A protein has these predicted regions:
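A glycine-rich helix N-cap at a beta->alpha junction
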Residues: 78-94
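Short secondary-structure capping/junction motifs at helix and strand boundaries
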Residues: 89-98, 116-129, 141-142, 156-159, ...
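Cys/His-rich short segments
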Residues: 118-171, 175
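Intrinsic disorder at enzyme termini
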Residues: 476-557
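Helix-rich, typically C-terminal accessory recognition domains appended to large enzymatic cores
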Residues: 123, 346-383, 394-502, 615
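Structured secondary-structure scaffolds
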Residues: 2-51, 103-107, 151, 157-372, ...
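N-terminal catalytic cores of NTP/NDP-binding nucleotidyl/phosphoryl-transfer enzymes
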Residues: 2-78, 97-112, 117, 134, ...
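Phosphate-backbone binding interfaces of nucleic-acid-interacting proteins
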Residues: 536-658
Length: 658
């Protein structure tokens, strides 16, 4: 038996749906999981941290068609965008799984066949209501005013042949398991919701295949069916670590399953605490030890959504505040159970009060005084006073409290405790007044001891901070010229090496910000985007048309517009424009230059060779200082995404659209 082996710990996030760029509310989950994973590593666990993307479904098939690309091309682009955001936020995942990965698709097919062969899946017909954005089926009794109970969007009637999973068969066993394992669903309020709203009233069998679209994993023995999202997406947690239902699973699966923690949003907890454990029971696999449904990060008027126009993106916030400031904010402001709120005002407030003042100023003052009074040398002269014990007690108690909080997944409370070290250290400076001690040569040893205690307290605080703000932690420790302390060694105060020398020039960790300046930049950013939109729409719409309420026109008016098919032969970005692409479009025997506000959805190199619908008799106009000789037609979905209007069949450029 291996006596020195680390205990495995498997943590996963929900895999992100590849319908668009993730906003800061989505990003919160990966940052939260990263903080937990990093802390578990500090505790000595052998951590495996998995995240990824959910890439199949009708919604993606429709979005890809609107964009004029294949579903695989569409999800490749979005998955890359999601991974870039996860990497920008400095998250330490070990695996980024995509449900279009070949090994995942093969295992899903084998799992489907196994469950069918053992009688847990059967063929039938579905008739009811369906929400495409949520990919959820509903009965008429569950729907109010024709709207999806989850997202509030309209549902549509659906009727199709489908395979179903016998949920009802396993419901009693799951109820028994939840009652015997109260830690399985957290927080407790989520457990009560699942029991009272779904399990106790009785489960209906679950649709696990579709025939009304093609973008999915085919059912091997009935290929007109594709595997529905839940049997596909949920199984990533086992396929990603090498599960094989034929009994040939990788050593990684044997080592890490069952998962220690599935970290998910509260809106998908039903699928992870009812459907997923029942699938696992049917496969004869142990259930994950805990599923935690975290709250939402809201922006003032509710849940973020593109349709509401209240979306904030991580990369935008990072441009303003930096990676660790954004990490601190989302981790600090999100309670254990209730939703948190994000706003520019609150972020600036935290930046100034917590990061620049409490933390940054403390480090700067300590390093500066050490250089000023002792040439940067830190030395404990043993000139102790009772106030020192209060500082030491706060630090050592905090180490224990942080450990307790993190074991209970109370991450916001843990980071608050860490900042109590920095608050107490600032108070210690006020209590000991090093600048006064420096005036008295007889108190030089006392001054040295005070600065040693401050350096030691900051070292322990910065070491604790690593799981939450890794870059800041490393910067602080570099200024103190010391290594990150292990959790075990944090339980002892006074391990900072005597005679060590801090950096000569302290680095400003966080600069104070003026809310007026920030809001001016934010408003300028919004205004620039709005102006560009307005300029583009001005050209795209008939002059004099009332955009808010378009007047009726006669057929003769419509007949004045000429629509033709054009082939894009060259395309490039417009300098200094965030939204415009400049395309050279061949229309019959002539080539025209046309500007379009589609940069966010299409790369220039992807435009070349496309055939598009063009309004060819518009009066030329200047956009961003460049001449545009027509308009390329696009469609806009309810989330503001644009898709080129392309002919269903290949036709010659110059062909008239009628």
């Amino acid at each position: 038996m291996c006596t020195n082996c680390k205990k495995p710990y498997y943590i996963s996030t929900a895999i992100a749906y590849t319908s668009g760029k993730p906003h800061i509310g989505n990003t919160y989950e990966i940052v939260l999981a990263d903080a937990i994973a990093r802390y578990k590593r500090e505790q000595g666990y052998d951590v495996y941290f998995q995240t990824g993307t959910d890439e199949h479904g009708q919604k993606i098939e429709l979005k890809a068609a609107d964009a004029g690309v294949t579903p695989k091309e569409f999800v490749d682009g979005v998955a890359g965008q999601i991974k870039e955001i996860w990497d920008l936020m400095n998250t330490s995942y070990d695996k980024f799984i995509r449900t279009t990965d070949d090994y995942h698709e093969k295992q899903v097919q084998k799992i489907f066949k196994k469950l069918y062969d053992q009688g847990d899946i059967y063929k039938g017909h579905y008739e009811g209501l369906y929400c495409t954005p949520c990919e959820s089926f509903w009965t008429p009794s569950q729907v109010v005013d024709g709207k999806c109970p989850d997202c509030g969007r309209p549902v549509q009637p659906a009727k199709e042949e489908a395979y179903f999973f016998r949920m009802s068969k396993y419901a009693p066993k799951l109820i028994e398991y939840i009652n015997e394992h109260p830690e399985f669903i957290q927080p407790v309020s989520r457990k009560n919701e699942m029991m009272n709203n779904f399990l106790l009233p009785g489960l209906q069998d679950l649709c696990v295949s579709r025939t009304s679209f093609k973008w999915g994993i085919p059912v091997t023995f009935d290929p007109k069916h594709v595997t529905y999202v839940w049997l596909d997406a949920l199984t990533n947690y086992i396929t990603g670590i090498g599960y094989d239902c034929d009994g040939n699973s990788d050593e990684k699966f044997k080592k890490y399953w069952p998962a220690d923690l599935h970290l998910i949003g509260k809106d998908i907890i039903r699928f992870h605490t009812i459907y997923w454990p029942i699938f696992l029971m049917a496969l004869g696999l142990p259930l994950p030890k805990q599923v935690f449904g975290h709250p939402w990060l809201l922006q003032g008027d509710g849940k973020m959504s593109k349709s509401k126009g209240n979306v904030l993106y991580a990369d935008t916030l990072v441009d303003f505040f930096g990676v660790d400031a954004v990490r601190y904010f989302v981790l600090h402001e999100m309670p254990f159970e209730n939703d948190g709120v994000i706003s520019w005002d609150l972020m600036v407030e935290r930046m100034n009060s917590d990061l620049a003042n409490i933390l940054g100023n403390l480090v700067n003052r300590t390093v500066s005084m050490t250089n000023k009074y002792f040439g940067g040398i830190v030395e404990n002269k043993g000139a102790a006073e009772p106030v020192d014990e209060e500082l030491k007690a706060t630090v050592l108690e905090t180490v224990k409290k942080v450990d307790e909080k993190m074991n209970k997944l109370r991450v916001a409370d843990a980071i608050t405790e860490i900042f109590n070290i920095f608050r107490r250290s600032n108070k210690y400076i006020d209590e000991t007044t090093p600048w006064t001690l420096a005036k008295d040569e007889a108190k030089k040893d006392r001054l040295a001891t005070v600065l040693y205690n401050l350096t030691e307290a900051i070292t322990i605080g910065a070491s604790l901070l690593f799981s939450f703000m890794p870059q800041t932690s490393e910067k602080i420790l570099a200024q103190l010229n010391t290594e990150k302390r292990s959790l075990e060694n944090m339980n002892t105060f006074g391990l900072y090496p005597n005679g060590n020398k801090v950096t000569e020039k302290p680095e400003i960790l966080f600069a104070r910000m003026d809310i007026k300046d920030v809001m001016e930049k934010v408003e300028a950013m919004k205004a620039a985007a709005a102006a560009e939109n307005k300029e583009e729409k001005k050209e795209e719409e008939k002059p004099g048309m009332d955009v808010e309420k378009k007047p009726e026109i006669t057929y003769d008016d419509f007949a004045k517009l000429q629509f033709q098919i054009g082939e894009i032969v060259k395309c490039e970005e417009v300098p200094k424009s965030k939204k415009l692409l400049c395309s050279q479009v061949k229309i019959g025997s002539e080539t025209r230059q046309i500007l379009s506000g589609i940069k966010a959805w299409y790369k220039p190199e992807d435009m070349v060779g496309r055939k598009v619908m063009v309004v060819t008799n518009l009066k030329p106009a200047k956009l961003a200082g460049m001449l545009s000789e027509g308009m390329i037609l696009c469609a806009e979905d309810d989330e503001g995404n644009l898709a080129l209007m392309t002919p269903a069949k290949d036709v010659k450029s110059g062909s008239e659209v009628c």
